[in-house]
Amino acid sequence: TAGAAFTICFFVTFVIHFGGTIAIIALIGLAVFMLIRSQVMYKKRKEKEKGNATIKQLMQSTDNMEILELLRKHTREELGKILEFTEDNFERTVTAFLHENLRGLRRAMGSVKFEKQLIKQMKRTGTLAMCRLDNNTVLEKGLYYYQGNDFASELVYSVGRLCEPCLEHIDNNFKPLDTIQKGEFADVTEDIVYLLQVCRHKLENNNYNNFEEDIHKANDLNGQLAHLKREELQRIQSQSGSIKVSMVYLTMIQEAQNIVTYSINLMKVSRKFQAEE
């Protein structure tokens, strides 16, 4: 330990001696970055431990109602994380693509791959938890639980299907979207992200007041996206643009529609699973 401390001190002194003020600023920046990163990792670890504690308590309980309530709590936590992932990475993917940011797209794709593994783990844990409930409860609530997991999985895969062609398009230096396409999709993206935020907050708080308004908003968004799709197909027919650009744009529209639909469907089955009957 003493040797390591001596080595670090020597290195810092060496850098400051030859780097001067710039080196000092760089070292301060590095220290701040490491501190922030440490805090983020600590927060994530605590959240994971909290989730594990709920599952551990669930597996140890023999009371059917307590098991159901713990599973409901665990489900709100897990599905809330999925909606947050979708919100963040849908926006990140679209923004990175519109600004031709290859690094941002690669980061989003890496997040998708990691989230797919978490989805598999969530489903395995959920199956074990459902086995702890009595048959009547499983018959009454099981379908809604499994449907919720399926819609959550589809959200993650939709973000992946959106990100992959965008990443390939930018990586190959293909022609970007034109100004009209960028403006159209940027506007609808903002509304979709807001809808995802609203859905997540309602799901996490188990408060579905005015949910019919969210359904109406989702229908409006899908209508807007369908209109964008028709306009793009007309551009293809008139041969007024690049086919490669049109194909990636149509994929973006389709996956955006899927994300809106899966999010609302997730909320519907979550409300039924959480309902006290």
What are these regions (language model features)?
Residues 10, 22-28, 107-110:
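Composition- and surface-driven signal marking solvent-exposed, interaction-prone regions
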Residues 3-23:
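Transmembrane helix-loop junctions at the membrane interface of multipass transporters and ion channels
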Residues 39-277:
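Cytosolic, long alpha-helical scaffolding segments
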Residues 26-38:
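Hydrophobic core of alpha-helical transmembrane segments in multi-pass integral membrane proteins
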Residues 2, 33-35, 181-185:
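Short, conserved aromatic-histidine micro-motifs
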